[in-house]
């Protein structure tokens, strides 16, 4: 049994039986874990209103196998006030993490980035795109996705802000005259290295890059949060 309280957030919930749920959590010291929340679907369960997304939680669990049982859960603070765009963006972040993080692998630095991301989504709804791009880059780094944005992978020369570069998976960025979805301008690559998305063109390029880079981790199944976002606000995800 986990004796000390563990900080965590709900990433995803799914029905397990008539009265229970399987809940994916992102925890500070244990990474992504799936816990059985017994009886939580019953009307009088004290945990029913606690196990909600975007609520900072304190957790305890027990068990020796792969599937452990949640024993205690308390809100560490109030649920973050997500509104419309921020809400769907938060669901997107949660779904990405639920898919890409290895079970029982600690990502303490990414947990802090996640907390910062959620706080900023709730407090800065007009800055959603740069907030998401920053977190996507931080997630790629936590996964060990190493790419050099500052040097040509073929020659080792510093990236020229005015030149175009072709992204090749497992290699990096190579100077090229080709123009396609894998082409990026040098100035944007240098901005990626600093996670500086203050310019609109760089922000759009960053979104294109993270979609390419995250695809091998996410798999072929479409993101449900993105489909929901598109159905409610179809113009927001174009491009």
Curated annotation (Swiss-Prot):
SUPFAM superfamilies listed in its UniProt record: ArfGap/RecO-like zinc finger, Nucleic acid-binding proteins
Entry-linked InterPro entries: ARFGAP/RecO, DNA_rep/recomb_RecO_N, NA-bd_OB-fold, RecO, RecO_C
Biological process annotations from GO: DNA recombination; double-strand break repair
Keyword Lipid metabolism: no
Coiled coil start-end: none
Keywords annotated in UniProt: DNA damage, DNA recombination, DNA repair
Superkingdom classification of source: Bacteria
UniProt family annotation: Belongs to the RecO family.
Physiological role: Involved in DNA repair and RecF pathway recombination.
Protein name: DNA repair protein RecO
Protein's organism: Glaesserella parasuis serovar 5 (strain SH0165) (Haemophilus parasuis)
């Amino acid at each position: 049994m986990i004796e000390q309280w563990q900080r965590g957030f709900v990433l995803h919930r799914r029905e397990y039986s008539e009265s229970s749920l399987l809940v994916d959590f992102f925890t500070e010291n244990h990474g992504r874990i799936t816990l059985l929340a017994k009886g939580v679907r019953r009307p009088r369960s004290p945990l029913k209103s606690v196990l909600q997304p975007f609520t900072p939680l304190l957790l305890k669990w027990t068990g020796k196998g792969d599937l452990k049982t949640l024993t205690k859960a308390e809100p560490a603070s109030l649920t973050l006030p997500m509104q419309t765009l921020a809400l769907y963006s938060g669901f997107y972040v949660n779904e990405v993490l639920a898919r890409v993080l290895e079970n029982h692998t600690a990502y303490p630095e990414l947990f802090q980035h996640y907390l910062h991301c959620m706080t900023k989504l709730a407090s800065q709804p007009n800055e959603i795109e740069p907030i998401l791009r920053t977190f996507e880059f931080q997630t790629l780094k936590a996964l060990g996705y190493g790419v050099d944005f500052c040097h040509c992978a073929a020659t080792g020369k510093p990236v020229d802000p005015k030149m175009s570069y072709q992204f090749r998976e497992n290699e990096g960025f190579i100077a090229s005259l080709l123009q396609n979805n894998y082409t990026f301008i040098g100035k944007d690559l240098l901005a990626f290295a600093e996670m500086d998305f203050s310019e609109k063109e760089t922000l759009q390029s960053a979104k294109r890059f993270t979609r390419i880079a995250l695809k091998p981790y996410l798999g072929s199944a479409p993101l449900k949060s993105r489909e929901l976002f598109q159905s409610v606000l179809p113009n927001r995800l174009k491009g």
